[in-house]
Amino acid sequence: MPRKKAAAAAWEEPSSGNGTARAGPRKRGGPAGRKRERPERCSSSSGGGSSGDEDGLELDGAPGGGKRAARPATAGKAGGAAVVITEPEHTKERVKLEGSKCKGQLLIFGATNWDLIGRKEVPKQQAAYRNLGQNLWGPHRYGCLAGVRVRTVVSGSCAAHSLLITTEGKLWSWGRNEKGQLGHGDTKRVEAPRLIEGLSHEVIVSAACGRNHTLALTETGSVFAFGENKMGQLGLGNQTDAVPSPAQIMYNGQPITKMACGAEFSMIMDCKGNLYSFGCPEYGQLGHNSDGKFIARAQRIEYDCELVPRRVAIFIEKTKDGQILPVPNVVVRDVACGANHTLVLDSQKRVFSWGFGGYGRLGHAEQKDEMVPRLVKLFDFPGRGASQIYAGYTCSFAVSEVGGLFFWGATNTSRESTMYPKAVQDLCGWRIRSLACGKSSIIVAADESTISWGPSPTFGELGYGDHKPKSSTAAQEVKTLDGIFSEQVAMGYSHSLVIARDESETEKEKIKKLPEYNPRTL
């Protein structure tokens, strides 16, 4: 199986682990630097979940190729006005979204020295926090959450921060906060879950975490964003280093029902099944047939970031002989993002993937980056469709409609990659209820059990307990959670979060026996 060379992989993975450095002399697209003029092209509408004008994308030959469809300049670029998606009030749906039906107590295990996660050492400006937080090798409960019932936990494969939504729909956050991604109005690290005051008047139904940014969705379908906005990943129409308080994104279309965040980009889906993306276009992960790359002055490479949500207008399939055909009438039902790739599940149970192709994470049996959503062939057969999708840092998962779990990409990037979807034999016959991926570890709630695996080094996110093996290449039951029913699992870069059901007295007793974690604070 071909494997991405280390040198090539360096293009994607941060060289210093701090999430900004990249190989080569490239500069990340910032507000500085003159944007070069691009020739206008005719546009025609095609694909997508509903009508509405949108850039037609040229599909002569392979998509991408650095081409981009012409469009009006976005705010902050050449002084043009941002093109904000707007739906007239009388045709706008009125929705009241429901949050998850789960109820339980939050458990955490893994790395909790938030500023050290994914880095060799704590940065100088965070030096005071150097010795705060430890690796929790088994499940713990937070002392400060006694009596708080949780319905959703959220983190991300690139994230060193976490969120929880209470049964009342209130959003709490904690962890790394260098860019204000916790939404508390400052950039101070927070050791244990704390209510986001700026959203206390809203009922939050779901949320998503990028590397240093956060999106929150209200019950009426509005989206609030906070954290890093250097690449426009907050969708506020500008590029700024940090936005520490929740701000509503520049979008006035149909209500949003689903969201996902990659490392430095975001995806939102409306109630009609249209998909919109914004942020860093570097590997084509926004799906607009371009990687947004251009040469600025002094031969510097910069990126033309999308600063407001823009519709993903075209979906394609490639035939065996290399022909590219548009796939019309795609109605999106779910979306998931890895560090630099995106997966979509549509109403016909088909899966599309695009963005960074390294390690085979797109499932197209090749490592090419894809600039527009491309059909993953395996799930395009009657009875073979997908029912759930999940994206890891460098891998992808799907659960088929008959319940089989499929995997492609790589969790351990120093070993063989899986270039197309393959059944996960270890979990054959298990009913997958919830799955989450960290940087290289996986955790699954299946039937009555919790299962995890991941290569070394790990930091406790597998939950096997003290004095037990720290890593496992094969799926293993998490024995420390025996008798505890996991309603939902979530994973950050190297920590795990579980909602433990606490309906019966026996369940409450089991949870009570777990150690309490009361982190030291400054």
Swiss-Prot record:
Question: For the region Disordered, what residue ranges are annotated?
Answer: 1-83, 502-522
In this chain the RCC1 repeats are located at 103-165, 168-219, 221-271, 273-347, 348-401, 403-447, 448-501
Where on the chain is Phosphoserine found, per UniProt?
S16, S43, S44, S45, S46, S50, S51
Q: What is this protein called in UniProt?
A: Protein RCC2
Q: Which segments show compositional bias classed as Basic residues?
A: 24-36
Query: What is one term from the GO cellular component aspect held by the record?
Result: midbody
Q: What is the effect of changing K439E?
A: Loss of interaction with RAC1 and loss of regulation of RAC1 activation
Q: Tell me a GO biological process for this protein.
A: regulation of ruffle assembly
| Bias kind Low complexity: ranges | 71-82
Q: Which cell locations does it reside in?
A: Nucleus, Nucleolus; Nucleus; Cytoplasm, Cytoskeleton; Chromosome, Centromere
Q: Where is the composition biased (Basic and acidic residues)?
A: 502-515
Its quaternary organisation is: Interacts with RAC1. Interacts with nucleotide-free and with GDP and GTP-bound forms of RAC1, with a slight preference for GDP-bound RAC1. Binds preferentially to the nucleotide-free form of RAC1. Interacts with CORO1C. Interacts with microtubules.
Give the induction note.
Induced by TP53/p53 in response to oxidative stress and DNA damage.
In what way does this protein cross or attach to the membrane? Peripheral membrane protein
**Species name:** Homo sapiens
| Keywords recorded for this protein, A-Z | Acetylation, Cell cycle, Cell division, Cell membrane, Centromere, Chromosome, Cytoplasm, Cytoskeleton, Guanine-nucleotide releasing factor, Membrane, Microtubule, Mitosis, Nucleus, Phosphoprotein, Repeat
Q: Which GO terms describe its molecular function?
A: guanyl-nucleotide exchange factor activity; microtubule binding; protein domain specific binding; protein kinase binding; RNA binding; small GTPase binding
Q: Which residues carry this modification: Phosphothreonine?
A: T20, T342
